[in-house]
Amino acid sequence: MATNFLRFLCLFLGLCIGVEAQESPDVHVVVNLVQLNVAVTDKDGKYVTGLRPSDFAVLEDGIAERVATFAEGNEPALRVVEPTEAEGSENRPSESTIRATPGDAPQTLNSLVAGANVFVLFDTSNYMYRGFVFAQDAIAEFVRSLESADKIAFYSYNRDLSRAAALTSDRSRILHAVRSTVAGDEAALYNTLLLTVKDATQYQGRKVVVVFSNGPDNSSVVPPEDVAEFAQSAGVSIYMISTQDAKLEPVSTVVFDRMTAATGGKAYFAKNWMDEKRAFASIRDDLAHLYSLSYYPKPNANSGWRAITVKLVGDGLKKYKIRTRNGYRPQPVRFSSELMTARPDTSQVAPSGL
């Protein structure tokens, strides 16, 4: 059963594309609107506000792209390029960038909405016995502090994933789910994070996963590198709060730092409950100050990993620091139906063979 699950994950994450391509050489990929969450900060880490679309330059594999929509914080997206213009001859997909059919539910200009879809993933493994109530308090305060435009889902994990509260604007439902969690069992962080990211991909607009972890992963079969790449390709930013001192968990620290940086998020290492609250407050501020940029990729024969670079234009702006995801892998058409049309179950998920 474990072998079957690994084969499923291999297909799910697109790791077997090379083998499949040998059997069917006419594999195409889907490239629709690419959305970026971009943080701009000064040397002191303070957010730079009031920037315009013309202040940003976006490159994909070194190819200059045209910004299609632009928004700051939770403001509605401003249409910078009309759909007909963005999808004209300059941006019409080549053979390797076939557009999705309506059934594939592509991200479009009209699908971008204000606010973020925030998935909170809470560690309820046996690592969490100490400080469990303080962690619940910090999460509850975070939920109450998010802007009204944001929607929230609350999941918890130990060996399995529990979808305690589906994505909703109802804060009371989320708070009830937070208070109803109990601690116990081992921790399969990367298995459950993969499933959470997959759920997030079913929704339009900005997508964020906030992980609260109190210990290392000791049960997953999914490597963190695969989770990070899937999140990058899906445009899901990952934020991680670990209650373990970075010095005590050097391996986990490196993994958390790399995963969050690759997806445009951040990692925090909290030594006490006050640090936990400060970390959640920092994430809340980040969500409120992110710039959202989108573009239709120009023809690009590269069906593999595509590097994304975002720069600020103008000598007066080059001193600022940019944080966003650094690339993505176009989605194979043969997997698009499963990934884009599946809806998350509301029950617990226990992967076979774990």
Regions found by a protein language model. Give the residues of each.
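Positively charged n-region of N-terminal signal peptides that target proteins for export
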Residues: 1-7
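Scaffold/interface architecture of coatomer-like assemblies
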Residues: 20-354
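Bacterial N-terminal signal peptides
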Residues: 7-18
